[in-house]
């Protein structure tokens, strides 16, 4: 048993992005640090919303420019998969509301450094359904408010239909890290844990517990 400070940066393995989509090396050649600075410190419309000091602090908090190249690659691939899923969920032509919501969510996920997390969750939920034959719940908790999660089939509830708020799940002012509550059938839970351990390595998989005290 090890203790872990919630103030520490998240420890996550890398989701395997196909090389023909892009690599960290190709992104280093394609994008400058100024490109990344502008992309990660502005809003989804490209407007400046942070002071220079706040922007520099944000870059540092995300892990510096080397880390930003990885986050951008993951964010671009997440966008690619999300729009594929959006057309499967909503049809060939998306409404303005659907596109605006998707772009807003993707921008928040990117600028908070979480695209890789969503890719990994998508991966093991897909494996549970398609490879392991494990029943997966439709989604619950605040993650059910994410249209991106719906498009990736992490959840099966359309937040737009039920007026669910994404900000309850993830927003820049939220202190705690996001988590996606996922229900697996009892007899399949260990199958999913074993699959994740094999693919991402046992050192990247752990059971966690939180104790409350008065």
Question: Can you name each region flagged by the protein language model?
Answer:
Residues 1-214:
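Phosphodiester-processing cores and adjacent nucleic acid-binding clamps
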């Amino acid at each position: 048993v090890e203790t872990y400070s919630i103030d520490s940066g998240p420890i996550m393995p890398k989701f395997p992005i196909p090389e023909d989509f892009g690599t960290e090396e190709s992104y280093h050649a394609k994008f400058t640090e100024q490109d990344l600075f502008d992309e990660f410190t502005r809003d989804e419309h490209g407007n400046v919303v942070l002071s220079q000091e706040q922007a520099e602090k944000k870059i540092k908090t995300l892990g510096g420019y080397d880390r930003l190249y990885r986050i951008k690659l993951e964010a671009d691939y997440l966008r690619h998969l999300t729009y594929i899923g959006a057309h499967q969920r909503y049809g060939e032509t998306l409404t303005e509301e659907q596109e605006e919501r998707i772009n807003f969510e993707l921008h928040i996920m990117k600028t908070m450094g979480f695209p890789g997390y969503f890719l990994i969750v998508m991966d093991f939920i897909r494996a549970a359904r398609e490879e392991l034959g494990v029943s997966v719940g439709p989604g619950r908790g605040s993650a059910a408010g994410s249209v991106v999660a719906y498009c990736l089939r992490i959840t099966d509830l359309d937040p737009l239909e039920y007026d669910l708020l994404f900000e309850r799940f993830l927003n820049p002012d939220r202190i705690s890290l996001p988590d996606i509550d996922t229900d697996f059938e009892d007899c399949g839970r260990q199958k999913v844990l074993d699959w994740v351990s094999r693919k991402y390595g046992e050192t990247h998989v752990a059971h966690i517990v939180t104790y409350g005290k008065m």
